[in-house]
Amino acid sequence: MAPSEFSDAQQPPQHRTVQPPGVAYVPTEEERSVFRECNEESFWYRSLPISAVSMIVTQGLVSRGFLTTSSRFGSLPKVAFAGICGYLAGKVSYMKTCQEKFKRLENSPLGEALRQGYRKLPTQYPAGTSEFSDINPTTPSAPGGFASNMVEPPSSVYSSQYGSTSDSVPFSTSLGESSPSGISDNIAPEPAALIEDAPTRKPMTYDELRNRNRETYEMAVTQRSDSPVRSSQDRASRKEAKTNKYGDVLED
């Protein structure tokens, strides 16, 4: 066997790469025949029956009075609208069946594009990866000479960068210390001792309160009784004294 024949025999069979269709794509003859077949079958099997049923139902609703009619055209606008909606619904319902026919075509760019569109994951997003996975890549185990070049985790970097700043802080941030180290001791103490040394008021009994009210009442009554006597004495002294026509007391 010649070397050229041996090399040709070992070459793997080349698969034809199908490019996805673009905007200016020209369908092949097989694809055109499938288009015509889909158009005919969707009209006869889906659009026409659904459109006819919609028009009949609409005419029945108009005749029974559920739908109003136009004064000029009657029930024609509503029946025509129902027929158009049924036609479009039939075309849309047959779309999935037409796509399955294109997928069965071999060496068809349109069929290949449809098959690629129904894959679960595209090629640029391989399985097993997620956008919420760990950001830090796993570093493989290195030999002893390269062990120091491994990436340090963020937690240790953060602690090494910001761990030394605690020495420069003027006061201590730990909770175990009794007082800050950089703050002076000229802080006014809380008036706890004054509050404790203040005399506590004894509760007043009912008898003591009644006696106090009685004393207050007697003092008020005494003051009221003394005031008329004093006013009468002042009036008598004023009458005994000689006064002028203006009411002024004349001196002897």
From Swiss-Prot:
GO cellular component term of the entry, any: endosome
Pfam families found in the cross-reference section: OCIA (PF07051)
Composition bias, Polar residues: 7-17, 126-141, 170-184, 222-231
The UniProt record lists the keyword Nucleotidyltransferase: no
Record's keyword terms, sorted: Endosome
Location, primary (coarse class): other
Source superkingdom: Eukaryota
Residue span of region Disordered: 1-21, 126-252
Compartment(s) where it occurs, according to its Swiss-Prot or TrEMBL record: Endosome
Basic and acidic residues composition bias: residue spans: 198-217, 232-245
Positions with biased composition (Low complexity): 155-169
Keyword Transport: no
InterPro entries assigned: OCAD1/2, OCIA_dom
Domain annotation OCIA: ranges: 1-112
Similarity annotation: Belongs to the OCIAD1 family.
Protein name: OCIA domain-containing protein 1
Species for this entry: Xenopus laevis (African clawed frog)
